[in-house]
Amino acid sequence: MDKLRIAAYGGFRWIPPKAGAAGSDKFAFELYPRIVKRGHTLVAYCRIYPGDTDFQISEFEGITLKYYKTHSKAGLDTLVHSAQATFDVIFNNTADVVHLHSGANSIWVILLRMAGKKVVLSQFAMDWKREKWPWYGKLFYKVSNYITAYLPNKVAFDNVYTKEYFEKKFRRTYNFIPYGSEVKIPPSNIDILNKIGLQKDEYFLFVGRFIPDKGLHLLVEAFEKLKTDKKLVLIGGSPNPSEYEMKIKKTTDNRIIFPGYVYGDDTNILIQNAFSYIQPSLIEGLSPIILTVMALGTPLICSDIIENIFITKSNAIHFVSGDINSLNEKLRYALNNKEAILSKAKIGKTDVSERFNWENITDQYIDLLKK
């Protein structure tokens, strides 16, 4: 099988990413155009949420885009959408090989394999540990692990720790393929800084979803205790209406600002001009935003979970995960040791560019999809 016919769905919501997008969207945005450029065909199944009025394009950089309506409730949206995509693949024969995202979608492997489709599943993290899921959601993930472990033709993990967990529990061998770190160097204009009212090096930054896993409640409280004139800029929001987001935005500290969603070059410009980027995650897979921050050479403060340590090594400032006082201490350290954090960032930029290369990652995925 030289040229592949591939269908992809399950984790990403849209290609290209838009408001509410997450790491899986970035992953698909970087990987799939590269696969198509190597001569393969790929159908990506995107989501339409209630009230979504955006114009739906049918093609992006050679990728065929198909759309299905889904539910707005977190978790249920993936289930409903993936069911429709699965039946389209089977009954309309849109692909020979299916690339599924997330073990939550492993239930569809059964039908796909029965229909003669090859399935490669990408597992990004220990999702059953995420605080955003109720007990029944966590139970669903734990049960799905057994299907993930045995039924796909191949399974790829983006971090070695989840891979090791599965290998130890299920006594099987799996594949490790990380995210890439390359980013387009943003233009030198600072229009986005002017729009938000920022100056270079005068703000800390976070970009991502406002969900408990990301630890924003810890960051807000730690920053509120910090004596500085610098601002804390929290870019993003919740993919669905969220009490957690409302709680975060109740802060009375006027140094903390919420510009909403920002994408593309503007995001990278904000990262590149920040005094430091902060990633307070309680749980992660291999974090795309950390890779982006390090590739741009911006000083990084992040939680000491093993997935973050794997990427950053000693090239970031680490605080004890879940510990507000530890985070506050590291914020104070950064303010008083600018040259030290810049030195770490410079070394980290070189390191991630060598270890996390999108072209090599694309080659690995194509090899896996062909097996």
PLM regions with names:
Residues 282:
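Aromatic "clamp/platform" in nucleotide-sugar-dependent glycosyltransferases that forms part
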